[in-house]
Amino acid sequence: MTKKIIAKKIIALVGRPNVGKSTLFNRLSMRKKAIVHDLPGVTRDRKYTDGRIGSFEFSLIDTPGFEENPDSFGKRLMEQTTKAINEADLICFMVDSRSGILPDDKLLSDFVRKYNKPAVLVINKCEKAFDFDKEYYKLGFDSMVAISAEHGTGMIDLYDEIIAKLPEEDSAEAEIHDPIKGDCLQIVVSGRPNAGKSTFINALINDERLLTGPEAGITRESIEIDWQYKGNHIKLIDTAGLRKKATITESLEKLSASDAINSIKFANTVILMIDALSPLKQQDLNIASHVANEGRSIVIVVNKWDLIKESEKEAFKEEFYYQINTTLPQVKGVPALFISAKNKQNIADVLDSCIKIYKTWNKKITTSKLNEWLNFTTEAHPLPLQKGGKRVRVKYMTQTKTRPPTFKLFSNNPEKITDSYTRYLVNNMREAFDMPGVPIRFNYIKTKNPYV
């Protein structure tokens, strides 16, 4: 079974008046097709357009705002919304972060969920950093995203949630469920100058597509190459070598470095290329930390392995793994491969590792399994008693997003949870759910509810 998006999908924007449906409609259609006004209820009919986020194209429906209204006009507006829901493959259920959850939001969410359609809760008007309040979970949606339709922020996260929720379609040629088929896996190759990034890509695609040579810094801007690997659409992105900021003086190199850093922001997976003759410098660790902080998945590749003496390879690996696991705890267990791009040794293993870690990066864990694990783990190693004999407890957790896996944990006193205890939970989760090498994010929320 393979997740493939073959026919153009239909997405309906549903919500009460003035939550920003028409603004998002205009944003996704790339042109102004819907009238937008602060006055509620401007939209009265279903409107259709071709929408797009990145390379993903779909049909989009704007619907009238729902209000509990028994008169015939209100019923006719609701009929428009009902028809849109019936037509849609996916519902974007929109709410307004400024006003919070209102009774009409709850009524409409109950109505929408009766149709058992894939749905994403879209929390609009989030111009500033937004923390998902537990009130939003009461609407009953297991997928949610914060955006600003007016300013265009959160569109990448919206894309991720939509793709994850769209129905799967059978593919006769597929043997296993593979979440990247039908999508484009963007792989950025990053590292210090002269680590062999361009040589690696040339070897992978079996073409001298990129200029290479012994001189450091040949690549000055990010180069994208579309490629197919085992039936998967791959976009390989070669980037300029990244030196320490203090050593960068020329304006052109500053632009190249900025371009390379920007490419990492939009990557799915980053290959960190390291020169075996000059392994694990501070700049390598800086790049890896930046990738983890951006929430990207990472694969570490040690190139020029053919230049290391056979008698020294075992000791090299032991020291290398020790340094990686002690200096990069945020991606503990990250895969490391040892290759020779020049001799095309082990280069296919790199792509297999990228696909595997991409699946881990996309992993979704059910709430029941999470809390079964949480109860066992916190009972095995509880937090110490506080003054007065009261114990800090982590009572409940849920996964709020993937890419990277992000979790919300409810506690009676979250400010007392130490960094070391969080590391204990994260490391335990990696082992329990087989999640090596990807950033795992925990967000703690204070709750006084004894049942949550």
Curated annotation (Swiss-Prot):
Pfam families: KH_dom-like, MMR_HSR1. Keywords: GTP-binding, Nucleotide-binding, Repeat, Ribosome biogenesis. GO terms for biological process: ribosome biogenesis. Gene3D superfamilies: 3.30.300.20, P-loop containing nucleotide triphosphate hydrolases. Residues 9-170, 185-362 form the EngA-type G domain. GTPase that plays an essential role in the late steps of ribosome biogenesis. This is GTPase Der. It comes from Rickettsia bellii (strain OSU 85-389). The gene is der.
